């Protein structure tokens, strides 16, 4: 992340770690960094120049950056992975979204962190017949529900029946009030 800062690439912490900063459960996997879709190449070049191995998987909404394998602290440990997302829930990331990030100290590093609402929107928009893990979402929503803009979430996810089902579930469980 220091390479992105030094090179002037706008970015923010997203995904599970951003929700953790907001009070959600601690994530157990990779770190998600969000960049504007217009800055993909600049971000990839910045991270590669800093010594990270950049890979472009078949998914068209992210690239992956792996830290130096020697940074692993355990013999069988995989190198640290950073997913660099430029689309959230199918929507291109724009600079105005990154402008909503606030700086926090996360594990000893000052970093911009996206607010919970756009992250939850992306998670709900990603629900489908192939991925529909309500249990993980329930844990997050219970922890950060007061920080979420439910009107904005409902509006942004109204075209996804899986998101609608999740919103109905959390209303019926009285995790949130009626929308």
Question: At which residue positions do the language-model features occur?
Answer:
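Compositionally biased terminal segments of proteins
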Residues: 1-179
């Amino acid at each position: 992340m220091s390479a992105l800062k030094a090179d002037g690439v706008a970015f923010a912490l997203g995904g599970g770690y951003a929700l953790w900063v907001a009070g959600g459960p601690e994530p157990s996997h990779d770190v998600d960094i969000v960049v504007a879709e217009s800055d993909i190449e600049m971000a990839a070049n910045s991270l590669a120049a800093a010594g990270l191995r950049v890979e472009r998987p078949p998914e068209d909404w992210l690239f992956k950056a792996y830290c130096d394998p020697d940074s692993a602290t355990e013999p069988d440990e995989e190198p640290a992975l950073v997913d660099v997302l430029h689309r959230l829930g199918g929507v291109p990331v724009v600079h105005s979204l990154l402008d909503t990030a606030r700086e926090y100290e996360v594990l000893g590093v000052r970093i911009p962190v996206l607010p919970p609402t756009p992250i939850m929107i992306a998670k709900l928009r990603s629900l489908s017949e192939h991925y529909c893990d309500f249990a993980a979402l329930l844990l997050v929503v219970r922890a950060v529900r007061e920080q979420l803009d439910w009107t904005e979430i409902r509006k942004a996810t109204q075209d996804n029946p899986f998101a609608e089902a999740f919103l109905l579930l959390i209303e019926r469980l009285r995790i949130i009030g009626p929308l």
